[in-house]
C-alpha cells in the first residue's frame, strides 16, 4: 500500500471522527435543551447549524474517492468552522457583556425562518435569550466550549491538509 493511500485513509478517519464529535455535540445541546430545560438563543442555533454543516461535509468528504474531492470538503468543513467561530465568539462576548443583547428581535425571525426550524423545531427553533447565564461545564460556558471546538476544527483541518499534501505522491 502506498504512502498516498495511507495518508488519505488517515484523513478520512479523521473526518469521520470529526463528524461523529459534531453530532455528539448537537446531541448534548439537545439534551441540555429538552432534559435540563435550557432554552437555545439565536446564536446557539447558529452554532448548531455550523456543527451540522461540519458533520455533513466531514462525512461526505470521508466518502469521496480522490484527494482533490476530500480537500474540497475539508475546505467546506473549515469554512463552516469559521462561521461557528463568528457565532460562538459573538456569544462569548455577549455573555461577558450582559448589558448588550444579541438582538433577539433581529436574529430570531431570521433563524426561525431557516428550513430546519420548520422541519425540526425542537432542535433548531429559538426559544431563549443570549444573555441567559447557564451553569458552566468544567468551568467554561457552553459558548466558550463551542468556540474552543470551532477554533480547533478551523486549525486542525487545514493543518491536516497541509501536512498530508507536503508528502510526495
UniProtKB/Swiss-Prot annotation:
GO biological process annotation, one example: protein folding
Residue intervals on the Cytoplasmic side: 1-14, 66-72, 164-169
GO molecular function: electron transfer activity; protein-disulfide reductase activity
GO CC terms, sorted: plasma membrane
Parts of the chain on the Periplasmic side: 32-49, 90-144
One Pfam family linked to the record: DsbB
Membrane topology (UniProt): Multi-pass membrane protein
Disulfide bridge positions per record: 41-44, 102-130
Database matches in SUPFAM superfamilies: DsbB-like
Chain ranges passing through the membrane: 15-31, 50-65, 73-89, 145-163
The organism's place on the tree of life at top rank: Bacteria
Main location: membrane
Keywords (A to Z) from UniProt: Cell inner membrane, Cell membrane, Chaperone, Disulfide bond, Electron transport, Membrane, Oxidoreductase, Redox-active center, Transmembrane, Transmembrane helix, Transport
Cellular compartments annotated: Cell inner membrane
UniProt cross-references to HAMAP family, sorted A to Z: DsbB (MF_00286)
Function: Required for disulfide bond formation in some periplasmic proteins. Acts by oxidizing the DsbA protein.
Family recorded in the similarity comment: Belongs to the DsbB family.
Listed NCBIfam families: PRK02110.1
Protein name, entry field: Disulfide bond formation protein B 1
Organism: Pseudomonas syringae pv. syringae (strain B728a)
Lineage: Bacteria, Pseudomonadati, Pseudomonadota, Gammaproteobacteria, Pseudomonadales
Amino acid at each position: 500500500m502506498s504512502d498516498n493511500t495511507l495518508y488519505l485513509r488517515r484523513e478520512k478517519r479523521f473526518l469521520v471522527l470529526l463528524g461523529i464529535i459534531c453530532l455528539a455535540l448537537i446531541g448534548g445541546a439537545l439534551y441540555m435543551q429538552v432534559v435540563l430545560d435550557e432554552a437555545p438563543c439565536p446564536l446557539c442555533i447558529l452554532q448548531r447549524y455550523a456543527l451540522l454543516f461540519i458533520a455533513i461535509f466531514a462525512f461526505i468528504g470521508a466518502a469521496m474517492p480522490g484527494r482533490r474531492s476530500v480537500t474540497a470538503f475539508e475546505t467546506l468543513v473549515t469554512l463552516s468552522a469559521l462561521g461557528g467561530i463568528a457565532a460562538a465568539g459573538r456569544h462569548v462576548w455577549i455573555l461577558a457583556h450582559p448589558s448588550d443583547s444579541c438582538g433577539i428581535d433581529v436574529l430570531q425571525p431570521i433563524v426561525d425562518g431557516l428550513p430546519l426550524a420548520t422541519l425540526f423545531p425542537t432542535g433548531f427553533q429559538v426559544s431563549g435569550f443570549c444573555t441567559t447565564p447557564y451553569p458552566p461545564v468544567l468551568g467554561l460556558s457552553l459558548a466558550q466550549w463551542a468556540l474552543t471546538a470551532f477554533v480547533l476544527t478551523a486549525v486542525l483541518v487545514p493543518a491536516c491538509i497541509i501536512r498530508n499534501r507536503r508528502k510526495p505522491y
